[in-house]
Amino acid sequence: MFHGGGEEVGNVALYLEDHTGTNVVIDYGMVPSDPPKYPSMIKNIQNAILTHVHLDHVALAPWLASTWGTQLHCTPFTASTCELIWRDTHKIARIEKHPLIWDLHDLDEGLRMLRPTPLLEWQDLGEWRWRFHDAGHIVGAAMIEIDMKHTRILITGDYDTRATPTTNAAIPIEADIVFTEGTYGGRNHPLRSETEERFLAAVERVIDRGGQVLVPAFAIGRSQDLLRLLERSNKNLEIHFDGMGRKVTELMLQHPDEVVDSNGLQAMYQRSRRVTSKTDRKKAIERADVILTTSGMLNGGPALWYLNRLQDDPRSAVFLTGFQVPGSGGHSLLEKGSISIWGKDVSIACEVDLFPLSTHAGHNEIVEFVEATGARDVVIYHSDAQYSQPALVEALATSERRVHTQKNDVQFTLPITNSSSES
């Protein structure tokens, strides 16, 4: 049963149980909207598996750990980053005066119950066994393979079959049942290489005319990918790196086995100028070619401080690289050319552009991935029920493959086969 994420993007909480009574929760997140949206409550659960460290998958896990003593299984990088993400979640909830079902004591319990688990190592869970596979998407993201002896299940979490500068591509495995995210169902991405080249050309054009480029970026994954991408510029760019992305990069470098070319990331990180004080921010405004900082949707973070100072400079630019949720600062900037900065609507004279560098599988990638698993049953989740899910149902349903969509908080049953499972 989906307690969240069944008919929506984010807010993921999936409860699985079979006839033996073995059970598990996959993710327990929230939608960081205003106000936030939470999944329904789950009771008496001993094990949860967290696919990756984004808020919509892990935000409420401390409550599980503190309330039910739930063990929180995740990859080592995810485990090392949860504290940073959870503390930031608590801080924002306090500032915005939003309700949060856990407190700092619960956070400490969440940290105590983390169980770092490497990729590909089988783990026992009641009558089942399970293991992680690389999901792409961001560093530490994992797909979950569950072997129920007679049925093999694959839960993708967020995944991408296209490699990035810091992640490998997700590889399909054989499964009887696949739960696939469908964020981009019905939509295909432009070629990533073309978007990257367009981004680099735009950065160099702005520098040539004497401007600065502000790149608001998501802290986990996007900031590090952009740092590596900027390395390919023909210019010796002076990059100033601010915000939570800087801290996340340091955590990534503590897990080099989970990062593609960690030596390259470390070299580029050392080359960048790390912003750690107000004085450093003033230096960035005076000297930087590129300022890379959070937040990726311009909802807060140092990015607004920089934008407030660049607002009247038509030579400079703000380059967004991710989906901008309606209601976010980035969405307002793209649609209206203005943004709320500390409660005041401000018109921005800078050039503004969007370079979509999503690390979710697009429609075609989802279809190809699912077909390659050979699954007889497919459940689409983490997707829009009005557009994305119908498009994927139409593309995937065949006489030999059933495709399911599920509402939240409605129990559903999938058949178990008698086929044997192999290691």
What are the residue ranges of the model-derived segments?
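Active-site-proximal loop/helix segments of hydrolase catalytic cores
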Residues: 136-141, 149-176, 181-184, 188-190, ...
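Hard-cation-handling environments
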Residues: 200-321, 326, 381
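Short, flexible loop segments at boundaries between secondary-structure elements
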Residues: 243-256, 318-357, 402-422
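Metallo-beta-lactamase
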Residues: 83-138, 257-287
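Pre-active-site segment of Zn-dependent metallo-hydrolases
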Residues: 6-11, 15-70, 74-114, 161-167, ...
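Core dinuclear metal-dependent hydrolase active-site scaffold
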Residues: 1-43, 116-168, 282-283, 290, ...
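Cap/insert and terminal regions of metallo-dependent hydrolase folds
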Residues: 162-242, 317, 340-404
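Active-site neighborhood of phospho(di)ester-bond hydrolases with catalytic His/Asp-centered motifs
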Residues: 26-29, 45-56, 60-61, 72-76, ...
